[in-house]
Amino acid sequence: MASRQPDVPAIEHGSSGLLGKMSLPVGMHRRAFSYDDALDDTAPMTPPPSDMCSNTMWRKPIIPERKYQLLSKIEDGDSNIPPPSLPPSSSTEKVPVVKAKATSIIMNSLMTKHTQESIQRFEQQAGLRDAGYTPHKGLTSEETKYHRVAEALHKLNMHIGESTEEKQSSSAQSTPCSTPSSSPKQMRRSWFSQGSTSSLPAGDLSNSDGGVDKWSMFGPRAVQKSTTDPGGFTVQPYKGAQKPTPMELMRAQASRISDDPAALKPPKMEMPSLVSGTKNIPRGHNLKPRDMNILTPTGF
């Protein structure tokens, strides 16, 4: 039977009767019993042995005394090693156990200390401790990171603005007046139009510098404060193809119309209701008897 059915671990009550009805549970194996297999099997069904509960490990546990204490002596080859003496079970059961109840004050102090240590560890990993940042300044770590990125971008934009101004001044001296860079009608590719920047008073320009620097990272050209004119901005010109004037657009359209006379005719508007001359008659509801079940109130 044991070879045919797998053993299923179970918790059964000991049958030795040492403690009567209050006997402790004993770890034993219960076979998954099948009556069909028992009818076919001719082997006798034997009861479990009577000494099953006598050699359980939890009644007298094996506790090694100083597990790694004599390891160095064994490696050195010392033969005068006394055998490890096992303490009796009575002495192990009589060891007094001291239980201390943690108060809420101790738990709160431990939680606070653990939280502070985790915050300091996170700040060191994120690199916030290098710049002398302390969490008591009223700023979170994300805000300080944002301010540092903005400062770095501001310094980068200042260097870019100086180099572009030098390039613009050198190109204006060497090129004729028909180039797009010196033309009076410039295309301004920036987040702020000319009217919005020129209408600001002189006192608000210092406050709007931060906004300009903040948004300049999205645009292709940086809007920088002019070094010569303290009250205005220098807008970088569009370096690509020149925008055609309205007169050139009208000339090109007139030449296209003269080449193609069919373009002078207005487009035809096809309205089928006016062509046929009949009005759209509103159709009535196409209700069937089965639809009356939905339209009828529930009281009928």
From Swiss-Prot:
| Protein known as | Putative monooxygenase p33MONOX
| Molecular-function GO term, any one | oxidoreductase activity
Keyword Oxidoreductase listed: yes
Its domain of life reads Eukaryota
Function recorded in the entry: Potential NADPH-dependent oxidoreductase.
Q: Which family does it belong to?
A: Belongs to the P33MONOX family.
For bias type Low complexity, the affected ranges are 169-185
- Subcellular location(s) per record: Cytoplasm
Q: Where is this region: Disordered?
A: 1-20, 75-95, 121-142, 162-245, 258-300
- Which cysteine-cysteine pairs are annotated as disulfide bonds in the entry? none
